[in-house]
Amino acid sequence: MSDKNVLIQVKDLKKAFGTNQVLDGITTDICQGEVVAVIGPSGSGKSTFLRSLNLLEVPTGGQILFEGTDITDPKVDINRHRQKIGMVFQQFNLFPHKTVKQNIMLAPVELKLMTKEEASKKADELLARVGLPDKANAYPDMLSGGQKQRIAIARSLAMNPDVMLFDEPTSALDPEMVGEVLELMKELAQSGMTM
């Protein structure tokens, strides 16, 4: 691990909800290209930990350094850092009134990171990468659970993140759909994505 760049450094991370101490002093380094799994029983703080890494949950103590910047510092523009952190949730969170391609293009265009033309090209590339090029004009309700999750992954990849966080990405899927999502995650890991 020492020969790789540390991408995320967590120091004594704490998170409490009222008197319930969910995270109590987590310290870890996550290096570029590394794949890390957080394993534990239901209610043990796994989702809280992941959500803390991009400040969707604000820690009550400790530090999180992302690419060397302390993102827990209130002076830091967290939205700039969130653009580099892809997040895939248990639920797909796709916009039902937008096509698959529009869902993928939305953030890069709205944040002015790409023109519509660039985002369209990127969306086509990502749809091919996740094995769904024929679904560009489909709406989310026309897709299976596995297809929706692959689109959610493509949407996160559209921002060209440095790291991808997955919060139980297969738990809401039928058993036969799990394999296609795990295969995509395996391909991402093999390509060097930090996860």
What is each stretch, according to the model?
Residues 5-195:
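ABC family nucleotide-binding domain
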